[in-house]
Amino acid sequence: MAMVKRNNNTGMIPVSTKQLLALGAAAGATALQGFVKNNGMAIVEGAVDLTKRAYKAVRRRGGKKQQMINHVGGTGGAIMAPVAVTRQLVGSKPKFTGRTSGSVTVTHREYLSQVNNSTGFQVNGGIVGNLLQLNPLNGTLFSWLPAIASNFDQYTFNSVVLHYVPLCSTTEVGRVAIYFDKDSEDPEPADRVELANYSVLKETAPWAEAMLRVPTDKIKRFCDDSSTSDHKLIDLGQLGIATYGGAGTNAVGDIFISYSVTLYFPQPTNTLLSTRRLDLAGALVTASGPGYLLVSRTATVLTMTFRATGTFVISGTYRCLTATTLGLAGGVNVNSITVVDNIGTDSAFFINCTVSNLPSVVTFTSTGITSATVHCVRATRQNDVSLI
């Protein structure tokens, strides 16, 4: 007689053995699901307990033989020096997006500067004066972005990330620190005590990478047109790079900056030419455009101190009495140059140079130096200034 099951009707439906097994499996799965649902925590605790027992058994096995290796060194989060470490750098393609008329969002990564080690505590290569203020028109921080930002009135940073990439061996001693200060006019930290008090800070060995994510907000600020008296009102803040504890002043790494910034309200293009003028007493009377360099003078030396890296064309003239002598210091290399001396009255110069790291200084030595006018702009080596 065949096995049957009864339905709502009075008719009988024959069921095979295969169908009966399927029905039993479905019922068993439903029951198991309910058991796991009601006893899930107990099952997890049992599995953890079983794992602990197995781990202890492995440690006890072999008597007093050492099963684990203990390393003397750091606490949790410490990084052991590898034999070698490297990083492959891939080019970044800028992205432009815009959802509303009159604005554009720019996303890109730029090279900021080479980092040199130092024995004592040093910030931004020893250059003081709020070097890396976070503003799209700050030519000392950005080399590519100002050409676009100069066409807009306001900005909002959506994200900013500093990335330190080492280029030294793992035997290099010292420390590299990158930090963010919300006040763009605060003086640079004077020592390690002040540095340690920054809330947004990353420190690392020269051979280890580090990334610093800068906190941003949604506030619209004005782009720096060099006529602002209070930079706190227009800057998101300022960045800083500190080094200390090294054995020398060799290059140890590079700093890159990645950002996403939204620019608002197109305007006539702002100047990208830096102009600095000194009066007869040597006082600064004109400072317009990006702060690529600082200009100062004594009666015998005209000094131009760079505040940014890259390739520049410098042109200028100054009153003096005798022929001039060129002087270079730091990571500056002259690509082409023309100097014209008008003995007894003044001298003029045109220099195409590349600055690889800070500090870098160009000087002219003469006598009777008084007033001076110096222009500086980013360029390429093809902008040859030599006289044919």
Curated annotation (Swiss-Prot):
Residue ranges, annotated region (R domain, interaction with RNA): 1-102
Key words of the record: Capsid protein, RNA-binding, T=3 icosahedral capsid protein, Virion
This protein's GO CC annotations: T=3 icosahedral viral capsid
Region described as P domain, projecting: 265-388
Region: S domain, virion shell, residue numbers: 103-264
TM region(s), chain numbering: none
Entry keyword annotation includes Repeat: no
Cellular compartments annotated: Virion
Domain of life: Viruses
Region (Involved in encapsidation): 56-61
First and last residue of the signal peptide: none
Record InterPro entries: Capsid_prot_S-dom_vir, Coat_P, Viral_coat
Cross-referenced Gene3D superfamilies: 2.60.120.20
An example Gene Ontology molecular-function term: RNA binding
Family membership: Belongs to the icosahedral plant coat protein family.
Subunit structure: Homomultimer.
Stated role: Capsid protein self-assembles to form an icosahedral capsid with a T=3 symmetry, about 32-35 nm in diameter, and consisting of 180 capsid proteins.
The protein's name in its UniProt record: Capsid protein
